[in-house]
Each structure stands twice: as C-alpha cells, then as structure tokens.
Amino acid sequence: MKVQTGATGVLERTSHYLKAGLLRTKPAWFDVVGAHPPSTNLTKKPKLFETGGQKSDPSESIFTKINGEYKTRTSVEDRKQKNNSVSRVPKLQFLEDQLRDVFYHQHPWEFSRPKVLVETSGDDNSKCDWSHMLQFNKPLDGESVVQRTLWLLNRSKMDGKSITLFDAYDEARFEFYRLRMEEEMSSAVSREESTMYGAVFPSPHLEHGVNQEQEYIDIWTKVAGDATKVKTASKDGKSSNGSMGAEDVVEKTTSAWETEFVEEESS
C-alpha cells in the first residue's frame, strides 16, 4: 500500500485502519471530518517557474562551471546568509526617544540633577496637561520638553497650521529655559532672604567630605616637605664631604612621617 502523505487522506486511511482492525475505537473527530471533509490540500509543492524546469536541489547550482573551471567546494560568500534582515525582528523606534537623545546631547548637565526613582505605570505623562510645560506633580526636566514638543505638533495639526518638528522643539526648549531661569532665580532669592532673617545652612555632604579630605592632605603635605628637606640635606652632605663625609651624617632612627604624628599627639 502506498504511503499517503497528504492531510486530505487522513479520513480514508483511518477508515481502512478501522476495517482492518488496526484501530479498535473510532476517533472523536472521525464523524466530524466525514461530514465536513477538507477541500484544500495545504501541502507546499515546488513550482517550476521556467520552461526548462527547476532543479530539485538548489545547492547544485553552486557547483557550475565558472571561467572554464568547476567549483569543488562552497566559499564563504556562498554560505553567507543573504537577506537576513527579513527574518529579523525590527527595532521599535519612537519619536520621543529621538527627541530625548537630542535634548540630553545638547544639555548633558541635566543628567546631574536628582531623579525620583519610583516605579510608575508608564503613562503618567498622559495624565498631565501639556498645554503648559510647568506641571504640578512633575518636576521640570528634559521629559517636559519632549512632551511639550509632541503636544505642539498635535495641536498644530488640529488647528491646520504648518509647524515643523524643529520649530516645535525650539519653542518648547526656549520655554524650558525661561522656566529654569525663574526656578533658579527664585531659589537664590529665597536663600538670600532666609540668610537675612538668620537662617544657617549646613554644608552639604559633598562639601563636608572634601573638607575632611583636605585636612589629611594638609598634614601629609607638611610631612612630605620635611622628608624632602632631609633627603636633600643628606645628598648635599655626601657631595661636599665626599665618601669620607658619609660617617658624619647622622641617620634618623624614626621616619619623618612618624615624627610628625608624634609631635601632633604630644601637642
């Protein structure tokens, strides 16, 4: 019996198996497929596009005669996968990401400002009213410029005005500059007023760390200066007295580093 590979012959084969006793129980789908048999064979078959026909194995075309010689093995170029971008998953590209990249390349110091690392739902910007850049529940940053630019573009389409992406970005950027200057000016004025009324501002953690480090740097600078003087004096004594003058040079039993700290502890 010829083996049937087509999916349309499954009903016929199953009926033969039932009559021959190979299958004892009827499958659950037997009656359904018998009432509604498949009408289309979905098996893919090779198509002959040329009159001369198509070779069964496409790799045979590699070893054709080229310049009077036969190729005995495939080269790297033959084995290279061509059109590999067809099966590659395309990258998601958004206009917002391009605007963020442009803004933070033009304003790298915006990265130094503190950020609130709180997990959100991801659509908090859609809940804000971007008809104005300054928001109540969101600090002023580069994301404000991005969302304000998108709002200006969408608004221009609704009003029927022709505004380019660069014009919308520049308008949002200059508005950001104005609000940032107002924010810094307000902060400076409030600090001066607080100082005038007797407020004392503690040094920040960074400045405190620098001051602590500077104290040790000053100590080691003085110790290094004394050690340099001792080393220079010993060299001058050896050069003036010659080899015989080495006996007159008194060696120090303690280093200059230890002496400095001992003097500080005693004082």
Swiss-Prot record:
GO CC terms: mitochondrial small ribosomal subunit
Keywords, ordered alphabetically: Mitochondrion, Ribonucleoprotein, Ribosomal protein
InterPro entries in alphabetical order: Ribosomal_mS23_fun
Annotated region described as Disordered, given as residue ranges: 230-267
Predominant subcellular localization, coarse grouping: mitochondrion
Keyword ATP-binding on entry: no
Listed GO MF terms: structural constituent of ribosome
Keyword Iron among record annotations: no
Subcellular location: Mitochondrion
Subunit structure of this chain's protein: Component of the mitochondrial small ribosomal subunit.
Family from the record: Belongs to the mitochondrion-specific ribosomal protein mS23 family.
The protein's name: Small ribosomal subunit protein mS23
Organism listed in the record: Meyerozyma guilliermondii (strain ATCC 6260 / CBS 566 / DSM 6381 / JCM 1539 / NBRC 10279 / NRRL Y-324) (Yeast)
